[in-house]
Amino acid sequence: MNKEELYLAEDNLAAEIEEISEFVFNHAELGSEEFKSCKYLVEKLKEHGFTVTCPYLDLDTAFRAELYCGEGPKVAVLPEYDALPGYGPNKDEVAHACGHNWIAASTLGAALTLAKFKDQINGTIVVIGAPAEETTGGKCDIANRGGYDDIDAALQFHLGAENNMNIMTLAMDSIEFRFQGTASHAAAYPEKGVNA
């Protein structure tokens, strides 16, 4: 598998990827109520040979799909598919103001494209659908329940005003601080403490 083969495989899936985006767009649902979109995405993954768990971690509209391709790392893509109130044609309607229909389509598109090369990949392709990203933060719920603990790498796509390859955000980068010192009670034994 090389880049040209990947591009060709993606091109061959383009109509299906657009169909995914249109379905999710046309069935805009609020967070934790994405039953139609969740079911559609799950069925699409099953059609391509993925084994699916839904609901996932007791979250009704979360799912986890896997395609085992041999020993190796587990690499996940993370679709979002909830919508927001007040952005539809009428101000009280639900719509995809943040492009979650596109996020769902692009992440599934990446997984389905890689699935075409399952005999050439070592590892597992994982798709973890996170509900309620605009409200309660479905990815946080999944993380707090251990849903990413066995994942070696996770990829997320999002719309923006420009095409960027290198972006630093606090949510995507981590910084670790280590403080060294000696703890003591500030009132009883302040002289025994060493500030970090």
Model features per residue range: what roles?
Residues 2-97, 101-122:
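Acidic/His- and Gly-rich active-site-bordering loop/insert found
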Residues 61-64, 84-97, 101-102, 119-196:
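Histidine/acidic-residue-rich, glycine-tolerant segments that coordinate divalent metal ions
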